[in-house]
């Protein structure tokens, strides 16, 4: 793990705050940066002419789907223009990125309210103040502006990503990788999952977001927890999701012979026995009971990470059953049969 980016990101966030009431100069600097490095300014407004900008969108300029070379070029340009003293990062472990097609935190000028960008700046300032002092006043101001921004167009889970960028030891990133990772019992304790699971069904308001943050920080204090910070959690989530995605792509090419086909029927039956839905752990336990699996069969490890073979195969089976419409994936940490899953006539290969 290499978190060299944190010093740069936090210093830049602090300097960016000084432009809260001088956005014209900030926009001028952005144009200057891109001109100096020889890259076109991305589309940030309807007519390609930036009239206003928020700080999280500025961070998004170098935290989206671009090459590492261009990313480092932009960071060098920013360092020069804003006199950043921290080292230019070349490693970005644990940094979530935006979709290139959704890289602004505001709607274009004809679709946004006059106060939308102002509100984001207020949240940005409140977040930095909160990170420096978790006082009652700072916490309340953060809650106030987070909840205001929460209701604005173009704001979804990206708001938690933006907060994490600017103060990664204070705010938790709730992008899709982290949400997926945190509700897996292989990665976090049951007590934690039970406490946060329902809070991840939709973008949380400030009170629930801070509750998730606080519960997570409390979990980090446990001697058994291998993560001690939000950046470490994000890093491990990225590593694991990349591993799973790679395996899924590999298996996709030979799906007809996939070893996890054997779990289609047992998984559907297990969820039926559970009343139509259950946690991954409940589903696996029901499969063990129904199939009379031995401890030896469900304890086999494989791969460099010593991943549990049974749990992985059931997870892959679930992914394919989601793709084919038999299991619903809308609720994190809960596997639920669709109407098709409830009524399908089961064979070994469905």
List the predicted regions and their residue ranges.
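Short, positively charged loop/turn segments that connect secondary-structure elements
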Residues: 196, 258, 288-315
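Positively charged, polyanion-binding regions of nucleic-acid-associated proteins
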Residues: 254-281
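Short helix-capping/hinge SLiMs at alpha-helix to coil transitions
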Residues: 168-169, 272-276, 289-293, 330
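An N-terminal alpha-helical hairpin/helix-loop-helix interaction module that forms a charged
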Residues: 1-152, 168-250
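Minor-groove-contacting beta-hairpin "wing" of winged helix-turn-helix DNA-binding domains
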Residues: 333-338
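A short, conserved structural fragment
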Residues: 322-332
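Short, amphipathic alpha-helical interaction segments positioned at domain boundaries
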Residues: 340-350
